[in-house]
Curated annotation (Swiss-Prot):
This is Co-chaperonin GroES. The lineage of its organism: Bacteria, Bacillati, Cyanobacteriota, Cyanophyceae, Oscillatoriophycideae. The keyword Chaperone applies. Gene3D superfamilies: GroES chaperonin. Heptamer of 7 subunits arranged in a ring. Interacts with the chaperonin GroEL. One of its GO terms (biological process) is chaperone cofactor-dependent protein refolding. GO terms for molecular function: ATP binding; metal ion binding; protein folding chaperone; protein-folding chaperone binding; unfolded protein binding.
Amino acid sequence: MAAVTLSVSTVKPLGERVFVKVSESEEKTAGGILLPDSAKEKPQVGEVVSAGPGKRNDDGTRAEMEVKVGDKVLYSKYAGTDIKLGGDEYVLLAEKDILAIVN
C-alpha cells in the first residue's frame, strides 16, 4: 500500500462535512497572566478551509451548504474530529455542529 501524505489541499470533506482551521487560543488572560497549554480552553472558532458538496436529499439532489470556504464559524465545543497538519490544528465537522457564521 502506498503512503499518503496529508495536506490541507488533499483533504476533501464528503457529504455535509466541513474542514475548519482552528483559530489560535488566547495566550494570556484579560489581566495579563500567561496561560500554560494545559490551562487553555479548546477554541470554538475557525475558518472554513473546504466543504463537502452538501447532504443528499431523498430525491437524489443535494442540499446547498450554508457555509462556504473563507467563512469564520462558531462550532460546538466537543464536535468533530481534531486533525493536526503541518503544525496547525484543524477540525472536521458535520455542518449541523456549526452554530453560527461570525462576521
